[in-house]
Amino acid sequence: RDRHVGRAIALLHERPADPWTIDELGRQVGLSRSALHERFAQLVGQPPMQYLANWRMQRGARLLREGNATVATIAQEVGYDSEAAFARAFKRSVGQPPAAWRRAQRVATPPLDVRNP
């Protein structure tokens, strides 16, 4: 493993809502933008900003599925400036708008009935 790439991944996971750029991420981990981009893509299989976009979608999907926060709140938590921008990116990634996806997930996985174990 590469400690710089590992640190970059940790930062993206810890602070997905930060307005990351490849320059800022490189500064944080002590690499030039080109060195970080090359190492990250080689080890992870995708460039850092693409990884961040995918991570934001994964985290957003988990928050939609497991919580009751509004789509606007989730959008901010995962780094989008607006609910509309998050909704567009989510639909492009998942194939459904966030609210429709959330409803479908809840129908597909109803809560357990703990009264009748």
Residue ranges of model-derived segments:
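A short, glycine-centered helix-capping/turn motif at helix boundaries
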Residues: 31, 67-69
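Residue-level recognition of oxygen-bearing side chains
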Residues: 69-70, 85
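Basic/polar phosphate-binding segments, predominantly the helix-turn-helix DNA-binding elements
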Residues: 7-58, 75-100
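Short, basic, alpha-helical segments at the C-terminal edge of helix-turn-helix-like DNA-binding modules
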Residues: 52-62, 100-116
